[in-house]
């Protein structure tokens, strides 16, 4: 049972990165009241030095100084996933070994912890599968009622997992954006906490622990390149936060380049990058088509401007992968003992054939193959 007496740490305020509007801590507001855009957190922590981490909890909560919430009670031991070499200079972080089998647990535990403090009547979320599963699991752990909105065509295995945790599943006709729109409408009801992995900045402050772990795994340094799959950009933006925190604290002397990977079938950000655009607003993007990488099939990500800026500021770039590259990468990883879902192999698909040159890199393997099965041959 959650220990509410431990929840006395003041919450930082949120603000809109577009117009600066501030949203006080402790409210159920999920977006900017003026522009309806996503929020950021007014929080600039200082990470602990490497040697001070010895003996701490073997989970992402070992980086307590960098997290906006303290005294976790909903934890399932998330974080501290293995880092294994795939080939010389390129390693993989096995985030598919999280409690719900995807990296989304990093952010979901922060959202559940926040919801406990705000004490809503209900929690709603939207997802193509993995975020919904993670939020359902952590809401179950926190004993919070939860409804997850998913688009039609979501993997049956992911739907089963969401339901198994006791969440109500609402399948919405249409694509990923249709599911998000339905969840946002529900989120406007009084007493509702919108556990959005896109709009709520607490999620990003959970995903940033991915890079804090890399830094610790690599003995206080980072690779030349951090390769990240991008749909809504939550892992990439979390990575950018962590890099900034480590650099500001003097714990790294150079920032790695962020390489953002999209499916060629749904690649609005890669198109904007190629056009030199700073946002998707007013930009004619190519039509989308079905993709095996359903988890990053986001035609209009709300944080597009932030994603493009983060990649540009890091000296990184965008890469796209074809459906055949995804199939081949999934089988290649399976032949090495790593069974990863089709979305989760996108980064390996992007770099396995030499896109990095001699630079060192880490790719995340974001979701377990059991969630989708092996992609069928073309």
Protein language model features and the residues they cover:
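PLP-dependent amino-acid enzyme catalytic core
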Residues: 4-378
């Amino acid at each position: 049972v959650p220990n509410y007496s431990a929840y006395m740490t003041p919450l930082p305020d949120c603000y809109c990165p577009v117009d600066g509007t501030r949203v006080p801590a402790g409210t159920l507001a999920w977006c900017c009241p003026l522009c309806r855009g996503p929020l950021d957190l007014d929080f600039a922590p200082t990470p602990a030095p490497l040697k001070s981490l010895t003996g701490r909890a073997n989970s992402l909560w070992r980086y307590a100084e960098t997290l906006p919430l303290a005294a976790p009670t909903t934890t399932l031991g998330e974080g501290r996933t293995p880092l294994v070499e795939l080939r010389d200079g390129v390693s993989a972080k096995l985030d598919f070994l999280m409690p719900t089998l995807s990296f989304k647990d990093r952010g979901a535990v922060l959202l559940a912890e926040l919801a406990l403090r705000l004490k809503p009547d209900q929690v709603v979320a939207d997802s193509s599968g993995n975020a919904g599963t993670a939020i359902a699991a952590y809401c179950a752990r926190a004993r919070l009622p939860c409804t997850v909105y998913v688009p039609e065509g979501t993997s049956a295995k992911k739907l089963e997992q969401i339901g198994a945790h006791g969440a109500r599943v609402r399948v919405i006709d249409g694509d990923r954006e249709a599911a998000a729109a339905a969840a946002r409408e529900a989120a406007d009801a009084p007493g509702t906490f919108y556990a959005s992995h896109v709009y709520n900045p607490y999620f990003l402050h959970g995903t940033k622990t991915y890079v804090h772990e890399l830094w610790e795994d690599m003995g206080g340094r980072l690779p030349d390149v951090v390769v990240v799959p991008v749909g809504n950009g939550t892992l990439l933006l979390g990575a950018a936060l962590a890099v900034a925190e480590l650099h500001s604290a003097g714990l790294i002397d150079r920032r790695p380049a962020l390489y953002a990977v999209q499916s060629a079938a749904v690649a609005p950000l890669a198109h904007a990058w190629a056009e030199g655009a700073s946002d998707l607003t007013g930009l004619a993007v190519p039509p989308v088509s079905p993709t095996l990488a359903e988890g990053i099939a986001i035609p209009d990500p709300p944080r597009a401007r932030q994603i493009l800026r983060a990649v540009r500021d890091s000296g990184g770039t965008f890469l796209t992968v074809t459906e055949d590259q995804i199939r081949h990468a999934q089988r290649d990883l399976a032949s090495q003992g790593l069974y990863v879902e089709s979305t989760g192999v996108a980064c390996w698909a992007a770099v396995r054939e030499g896109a990095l040159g001699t630079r060192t890199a880490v790719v995340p393997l974001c979701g377990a193959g059991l969630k989708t099965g092996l992609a069928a041959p073309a």
